[in-house]
UniProtKB/Swiss-Prot annotation:
Belongs to the EF-Ts family. It comes from Allorhizobium ampelinum (strain ATCC BAA-846 / DSM 112012 / S4). InterPro entries: EF-Ts_dimer_sf (IPR036402), Transl_elong_EFTs/EF1B (IPR001816), Transl_elong_EFTs/EF1B_dimer (IPR014039), Transl_elong_Ts_CS (IPR018101), UBA-like_sf (IPR009060). It comes from the Bacteria. Transmembrane segments: none annotated. SUPFAM superfamilies: Elongation factor Ts (EF-Ts), dimerisation domain, UBA-like. Associates with the EF-Tu.GDP complex and induces the exchange of GDP to GTP. It remains bound to the aminoacyl-tRNA.EF-Tu.GTP complex up to the GTP hydrolysis stage on the ribosome. The keyword Cytoplasm applies. Keywords: Cytoplasm, Elongation factor, Protein biosynthesis. Its main location: cytoplasm. Residues 80-83 are annotated as: Involved in Mg(2+) ion dislocation from EF-Tu. This is Elongation factor Ts. GO terms for cellular component: cytoplasm. It is found in: Cytoplasm.
Length: 308
């Protein structure tokens, strides 16, 4: 039997927002499995699906570069925000973003590409910057989107400089119409993606494993009602329809005009663009997403020093 430690309970509390005893029981019921325990708490109505740890804390910058039909978004991490605000670091992130345009957009290909400012590879240039600045840094993630005919619209939320910030979005729009009008609606949709973080463009593109996990949680929640299985099945189907509406971009209420869905807003924009519009891809990078920064307990450190 898996031992349930205080650290495990603490982690589950941070991830779920549930109380200590509920977390302890959830872990015991699920053999210490963290994700299964979160689902168990959700099924009991104790935790919310979108509750996050709140400890996402890597520093650095998101950088975006675009050539119209191709755009790339990169994440370069540093240890402190002080370095992220440094002009040299910002220039490097901007340079890496521009280099990434001529690669296939993967981290490996970008690291291997030549960084114009140094004549060395991006990877070696980052190592040189580490030696100069005295702080560890790394190219962590990158995504590139392309269209043959259309635009890849970009948006950086709360930009600290042109193309640099903490959150970057790309939206690829395929259309033979007016590119200026296309970019206008594309940027608005990129702002929408920044705000809502959709899981996919269309409902059928939502990851099957994610959808199945939601379905299982909804089944358990519905069974708590004590209703017959045929009623539960209808309840689950209704909740799944609502889930897909909430997480698929095209069915979401458009943040700029909530009276329209994103799909309806696109249809309206086609009047100005002069041709049909199809969203072929989206990318959204939030700085530090998925990284936990180690928190130091100052009181514990002092106590440890005092004990020798």
């Amino acid at each position: 039997m898996t031992e349930i430690t205080a650290a495990m309970v603490k982690e589950l509390r941070e991830k779920s927002g549930a109380g200590m005893m509920d977390c302890k029981k959830a872990l015991a019921e699920n053999g210490g499995d963290m994700e299964a325990s979160i689902d168990w708490l959700r099924a009991k109505g104790i935790a919310k699906a979108d509750k996050k740890s709140g400890r996402t804390a890597a520093e650095g910058l998101i950088g975006i570069a675009s050539s119209g039909t191709t755009a790339v978004v990169v994440e370069v991490n540093s240890e402190t925000d002080f370095v992220a605000r440094n002009d040299a670091f910002q220039d490097m992130v901007r340079g890496i973003s521009n280099v990434a345009l001529s690669t296939d957009g993967t981290v490996d290909s970008i690291n291997a590409a030549t960084y114009a400012a140094t004549g060395k590879s991006v990877s070696d240039s980052i190592k040189d910057a580490i030696a100069t600045i005295g702080e560890n840094m790394a190219l962590r993630r990158a995504t590139q989107l392309k269209v043959e005919d259309g635009v890849v619209a970009t948006y950086v939320h709360n930009a600290v400089a042109d193309g640099l910030g903490k959150l970057g979005v790309l939206v690829a729009l395929k259309s033979t119409g007016n590119k200026e009008a296309l970019n206008t609606i594309g940027r608005q949709i990129a702002m929408h993606v920044a705000a809502t973080n959709p899981l996919a463009v269309r409902a059928e593109e939502v990851d099957a494993a994610v959808a199945e996990r939601e379905r299982n949680v909804f089944i358990e929640q519905s069974r708590e009602s004590g209703k017959p299985e045929n009623i539960i099945e209808k309840m689950v189907e209704g909740r799944m329809r609502k889930f897909f509406e909430d997480v698929a971009l095209l069915s979401q209420a458009f943040v700029i005009n909530p009276d329209l869905t994103v799909a309806a807003a696109l249809k309206e924009a086609e009047k100005d663009v002069g041709a049909p519009i199809e969203i072929t891809g989206i990318a959204r990078l939030l700085l530090g997403e998925g990284i936990e920064k180690e928190e130091s307990d100052f009181a514990a450190e002092v106590a440890a020093v005092a004990k020798g």
